Regions:
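Charged docking surfaces used in two-component/phosphorelay signaling
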Residues: 10-18
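Acidic, metal-coordinating helix/loop segments flanking the phosphotransfer/catalytic sites
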Residues: 25-56
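Acidic catalytic/metal-coordinating carboxylates
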Residues: 28-31, 67-71
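Active-site T/S-Asp motif of two-component receiver
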Residues: 59-60
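Receiver (REC) domain active-site loop signature in two-component systems and cognate sites
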Residues: 63
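Alpha4 helix (beta4-alpha4-beta5 surface) of REC/receiver domains from two-component response regulators
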Residues: 70, 92-124
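The C-terminal output helix
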Residues: 123-137
């Protein structure tokens, strides 16, 4: 996942850990893209599909160096990542932000600092059980 906010990263990490999900945390879209390219190269070298190694991409919108819109556009335009959903997780919850996200290929939008909604979205996308109540706070 990509988020430049330390507070948001901690919340996302708690949510993913409560769900037993492995993750790579990055602080901006450029760093996330570099990590995704490494995974794609590894998948190709080992004869695996990227989707065996990357279940989804979770990204903030506003980040330095590369924002979530550009990251999403890169993921969605690269055939190596076909079938990898992108979830936008942001405090910019206006309809114009959501529409711009959809226009670059975002699969879902989850408002920031709503851990229950984030875990429900992730559980559905990852086909996992939800963590017990109280584990997300």
């Amino acid at each position: 996942f990509a988020d430049d906010s330390a507070v948001a990263r901690k919340q996302i990490q708690r949510t993913l850990e409560a769900m037993g999900v492995k993750y790579v945390a990055t602080i901006n879209g450029r760093e996330a893209w570099e990590e995704l390219e490494k995974v794609a190269d590894y998948a190709q070298a080992s004869g695996q599909a990227v989707t065996e190694l990357v279940s989804l991409v979770l990204t903030d919108i506003e980040m330095p160096e590369m924002d979530g819109y550009i990251l999403t556009k890169k993921v969605k335009s690269d055939p190596r990542f076909a079938g990898v959903p992108v979830i936008m997780h942001s405090s910019l919850s206006g309809m114009s932000n959501q529409q711009l996200g959809k226009s670059v290929g975002v699969d879902e939008y989850v408002p920031k600092f709503e851990p229950q909604r984030l875990s429900e979205t992730l559980a559905r996308r990852l086909q996992r059980e939800l963590p017990a109540a109280g584990q997300l706070t």
